[in-house]
């Protein structure tokens, strides 16, 4: 009997119950599943249909007591009871038939004693449960953000139709990974990491703990990416709710503290933070990961093969491509169209090929925004794209940049 501990952190998500149902219904051996759920809920949500199911271990948290994604995931890990395997998810997924057998077989195919298989999952639309793609994704590093994290993009794995086993990876995603159960004990989630940075932390820390990273060679799980129809943590943890004493701290302070910890762990800066048990492992070193993945954190370099998505390992320190070596510091003002009744305004800067060079998510309206960033590619246009209070995107407006 191969038991699987399914970890789900859910925040006010109407897709939680449909995700659980599909996970159970599509498993070949649903009797071997156990669920660890951190259920960060409001007053109208219900898990009543699973109340008497002994496969479920649920941490019940009112939404305003939550401290963020990785805090929830750290609590879930403590619910592990020796299951041979573990699958970590978000709370909005769909599954292939017999997904449990497929993932166990993938781990065996790697030939590794400590494999972790994961990536950005495929895409689905909850309306009609439409699965939007078949091709499996790899995670490709695009650039370092100003906060010190890496922005990743999904890319279809080249030649995936002919692949028969998982491929080596330099990154895995927190919203979908499958590994041996003792990862719950060995990789302790840092509860102080808010949201951004979870993936690079998961990747480098697992690697230094001796885990070998892989992407699945076929699509097994789908994910809902648009966030439409659900409240996000940062929607609730705002200044108004702090003033009304509904929450203790705005999300951006949690995020700032989180990124300082992350930069210290990645050795981008030394800020005297004591990471305790949430630092790197000792089986491999920080430098081992840099050479394997083609990344230099302190100088924020990406190897050209890393940027291109070539399968690792790189093992080449003689031909680094410093994205900022030939970079230019850009600073210019943009006039934001008057916007009312919005939840967020996406402001993006793109080059002539449509690559995102810089991004700002506005949660408060300003009529003039000063953009400051570095890039070795010339900005071509900026994008204004607001989201309304019901999580619907307004029309996107692209404006060619002429003042730089």
For the regions a language model picked out, list residue spans one by one:
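Catalytic cores of eukaryotic secretory-pathway lumenal/extracellular enzymes that build
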Residues: 2-281
């Amino acid at each position: 009997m191969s038991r699987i501990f399914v970890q789900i952190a859910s925040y006010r998500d109407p897709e939680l119950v449909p995700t659980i149902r599909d996970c159970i219904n599509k498993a070949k051996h649903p009797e071997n599943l156990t669920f660890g759920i951190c259920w960060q809920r409001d007053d109208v949500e219900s898990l009543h249909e699973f109340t008497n199911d002994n496969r479920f271990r649920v941490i019940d948290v009112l939404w305003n007591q939550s401290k963020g994604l990785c805090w929830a995931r750290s609590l879930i890990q403590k619910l592990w009871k020796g299951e041979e395997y573990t699958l970590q998810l978000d709370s909005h997924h769909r599954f292939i038939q017999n997904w449990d057998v497929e993932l166990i077989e993938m781990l065996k195919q790697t030939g590794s004693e400590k494999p972790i298989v994961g990536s950005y999952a495929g895409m689905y639309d909850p309306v009609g449960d439409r699965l939007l793609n078949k091709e499996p994704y790899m995670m490709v590093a695009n650039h370092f953000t100003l906060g010190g994290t890496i922005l990743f993009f999904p890319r279809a794995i080249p030649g995936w139709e002919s692949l028969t086993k998982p491929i080596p990876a330099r990154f895995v995603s927190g919203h979908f990974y499958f590994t041996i159960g003792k990862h719950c004990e060995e990789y302790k989630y840092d509860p102080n990491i808010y949201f951004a940075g979870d993936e690079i932390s998961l990747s480098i820390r697992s690697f230094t703990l001796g885990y070998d990273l892989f992407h699945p060679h076929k699509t097994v799980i789908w994910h809902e990416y648009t966030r439409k129809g659900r409240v996000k943590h940062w929607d609730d943890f705002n200044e108004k709710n702090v003033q009304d004493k509904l929450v203790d701290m705005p999300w951006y302070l949690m995020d700032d503290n989180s990124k300082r910890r992350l930069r210290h762990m990645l050795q981008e800066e030394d800020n005297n933070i004591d990471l305790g048990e949430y630092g790197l492992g000792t089986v491999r070193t920080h430098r081992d990961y840099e050479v394997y993945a083609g990344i230099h954190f302190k100088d924020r370099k990406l190897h050209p093969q890393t940027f291109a998505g070539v399968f690792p390992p790189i093992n080449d320190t003689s031909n680094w491509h410093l994205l900022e070596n030939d970079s230019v510091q850009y600073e210019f003002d943009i006039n934001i169209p008057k916007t009312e009744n919005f939840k967020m305004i996406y402001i993006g800067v793109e080059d002539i090929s449509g690559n995102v060079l810089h991004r700002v998510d506005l949660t408060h309206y300003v009529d003039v925004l000063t953009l400051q960033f570095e890039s070795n590619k010339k900005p071509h246009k900026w994008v204004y794209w607001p989201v309304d209070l019901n999580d619907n995107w307004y029309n996107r407006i692209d404006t060619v940049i002429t003042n730089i």
